[in-house]
C-alpha cells in the first residue's frame, strides 16, 4: 500500500502519492482500481524524428486554404480529433470561470470599457507581472499589453518590429499561425531547421542572419507546435546574444510554457533580455480558458507601439473576459488547476506514445516532448502524410499533415497528433486504424 511504501522509505504519505503520480504520468506504472499500482509494460520505444533542411527561403507564404480545410474537419464531433490544435475542453475549470464571468457582469458599468482600453485591465496585468516575478523574471505591468489571444499578440509584435517586405526568421516546421501572419503582413520567411528535441538550429540561424537582412525572429522556446521541441538553457543564451549583437528583435511565442512535465517551469528567453528587444507572447487559451481568447505580450521597449497598433485595429480585448480572468486568478486556485492539467497531459501523452509503440510500424519515428500536448511523427520519406490524411479522414480520423507547417512541400512524410484527450477505446482503435493505413501506404509503394 501507499502507507506501507511511505513507512519503508521514511517518507510522508503525500510525498509517496506525488511520486506514484509522477511515475504513472511517465508511463512506468499503471493504477488498477481497488487493486493498486503495477509496473507498466514498456514497448520498445520508437526513434525520434530527424531535423529538416537547415535553411529555406520563401519569398511568399500561401497556405490558408489548406489549413482551413483541415481545421473544419476537426469541428465534426464524429471525427477523432487527432488533427486538432486545441486541447481537450474537458481539462478546464469551466464552472469557476463561468461564476467569475457572471460576477463581473453584475459589476460591469459603461466606465469599465474605458478603464480597460489598451494596455488592458490593470488587475490582470499586475497578476501576470506577479507570475513573471514568481518565476524569477522582472517584468513591469506597464510593459504588458492584454490582447485578444496569443495570435493578436504575435501579429501586433510583428507589426511593431517589421515593415512589409522585411525578412523574418521562423522555425521549420513552424506553427501555421506564424505562416498566416507573415502572409497577411507581406513579410518574407527565412525558415530555419528545428529539431524535435532541442529546437531551432542555431548554426543555421547564424548563417541566415549573415546572409539576409533579417529584422525579427519568431519562435517557440517551449514545447513547440508542431514538434514539441524545447530550447535548452545554453541555446537560449546563445540565441539572445546572437540576436542582440545584430539588433534583431525576438518574438517569443510561449503559449505552451505552463504545460511543462518537469518539476519547474523552464525560463523563457525573455528572462535574459537586457535591452527590451524580446517580445514575450503568451495566452490563457492553452492552459485555462480556450474560449475567452485572452492573451498578452510583454513587449519591452515596444510596449507603447503595440498599444497604438491595437487601438488602430481591435481597439481593445473583451473587457468582461479580462475582468473575469483577473477575478479567477485572484480567487480560483489557478496553480492547483495547472498542477492537475500538467499531470493529466503527461499521462495522456504517455498513453498515446505507448499505443503508437504497440501498433505502428517500427520505422515510424515519434517525438518525446517534455510538455505540451503534441506528438510529431515521421514516416518513411517515400510515404505521403497528405495521402494518409485523406485516407484517415475517410475513416473518421483527423491528423495534421506536415504540409500545414511549411511554406513549401517539405515534411510531406510527417504529421502531428494531438495527445490531450482522455485515452479510451475509441482513441486506441483510431491509432490501430492509422497503423493499418500506414502499412497500406508502404505496401502500395
Where are these regions (language model features)?
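Conserved core segment of the aminotransferase class I/II
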Residues: 97, 274-343
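Hydrophobic residues in well-ordered beta-strands that form the structural core
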Residues: 170, 191, 250-252, 325, ...
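Short Gly/Ser/Thr- and Asp/Glu-enriched loop/turn motifs at secondary-structure junctions
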Residues: 34, 140-141, 368-372
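Conserved glycine-rich beta-strand-loop-beta hairpin in the small C-terminal domain of fold type I
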Residues: 343-353, 365-378
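Conserved core of the PLP fold type I
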Residues: 106-246, 257-275, 345, 442
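N-terminal small-domain helix-loop-helix segment of the aminotransferase-like
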Residues: 57-149, 156, 330, 398, ...
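N-terminal basic, amphipathic alpha-helical segments
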Residues: 1-102, 307, 311-318, 339, ...
Amino acid at each position: 500500500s501507499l502507507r506501507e511504501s511511505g513507512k519503508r522509505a521514511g517518507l510522508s504519505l503525500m510525498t509517496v502519492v506525488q511520486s506514484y503520480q509522477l511515475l504513472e504520468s511517465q508511463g512506468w506504472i499503471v493504477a488498477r482500481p481497488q487493486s493498486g499500482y503495477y509496473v507498466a509494460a514498456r514497448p520498445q520505444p520508437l526513434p525520434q524524428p530527424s531535423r529538416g533542411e537547415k535553411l529555406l527561403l520563401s519569398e511568399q507564404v500561401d497556405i490558408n486554404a489548406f489549413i482551413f480545410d483541415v481545421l473544419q474537419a476537426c469541428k465534426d464531433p464524429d471525427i477523432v480529433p487527432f488533427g486538432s490544435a486545441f486541447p481537450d475542453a474537458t481539462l478546464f475549470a469551466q464552472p469557476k470561470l463561468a461564476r467569475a464571468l457572471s460576477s463581473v457582469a453584475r459589476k460591469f458599468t459603461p466606465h469599465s470599457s474605458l478603464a480597460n482600453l489598451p494596455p488592458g485591465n490593470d488587475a490582470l496585468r499586475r497578476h501576470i507581472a506577479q507570475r513573471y516575478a514568481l518565476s524569477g523574471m522582472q517584468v513591469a505591468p506597464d510593459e504588458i499589453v492584454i490582447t485578444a489571444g496569443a495570435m493578436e499578440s504575435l501579429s501586433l509584435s510583428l507589426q511593431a518590429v517589421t515593415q512589409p517586405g522585411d525578412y523574418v526568421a521562423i522555425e521549420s516546421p513552424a506553427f501555421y499561425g506564424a505562416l498566416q501572419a507573415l502572409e497577411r503582413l507581406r513579410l518574407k520567411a527565412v525558415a530555419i531547421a528545428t529539431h524535435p528535441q532541442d529546437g531551432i538550429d542555431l548554426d543555421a540561424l547564424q548563417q541566415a542572419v549573415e546572409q539576409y537582412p533579417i529584422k525579427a525572429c519568431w519562435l517557440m522556446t517551449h514545447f513547440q507546435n508542431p514538434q514539441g521541441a524545447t530550447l535548452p538553457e545554453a541555446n537560449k543564451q546563445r540565441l539572445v546574444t546572437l540576436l542582440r549583437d545584430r539588433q534583431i528583435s525576438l518574438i517569443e511565442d510561449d503559449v505552451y510554457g505552463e504545460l511543462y512535465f518537469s518539476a519547474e517551469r523552464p525560463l523563457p528567453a525573455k528572462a535574459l533580455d537586457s535591452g527590451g528587444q524580446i517580445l514575450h507572447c503568451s495566452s490563457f487559451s492553452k492552459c485555462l480558458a480556450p474560449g475567452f481568447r485572452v492573451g498578452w505580450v510583454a513587449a519591452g521597449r515596444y510596449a507603447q507601439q503595440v498599444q497604438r497598433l491595437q487601438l488602430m485595429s481591435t481597439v481593445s480585448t473583451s473587457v468582461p473576459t479580462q475582468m473575469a480572468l483577473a477575478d479567477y486568478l485572484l480567487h480560483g486556485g489557478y496553480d492547483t488547476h495547472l498542477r492537475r492539467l500538467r499531470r493529466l497531459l503527461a499521462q495522456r501523452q504517455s498513453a498515446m506514445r505507448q499505443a503508437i509503440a504497440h501498433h505502428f510500424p517500427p520505422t515510424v519515428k515519434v517525438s518525446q516532448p517534455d510538455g505540451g500536448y503534441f506528438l510529431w511523427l515521421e514516416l518513411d520519406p517515400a510515404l505521403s502524410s497528405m495521402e494518409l490524411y485523406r485516407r484517415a479522414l475517410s475513416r473518421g480520423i483527423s491528423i495534421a499533415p506536415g504540409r500545414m507547417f511549411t511554406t513549401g512541400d517539405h515534411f510531406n512524410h510527417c504529421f502531428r497528433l494531438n495527445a490531450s484527450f482522455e485515452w479510451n477505446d475509441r482513441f486506441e482503435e483510431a491509432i490501430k486504424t492509422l497503423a493499418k493505413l500506414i502499412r497500406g501506404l508502404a505496401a502500395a509503394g
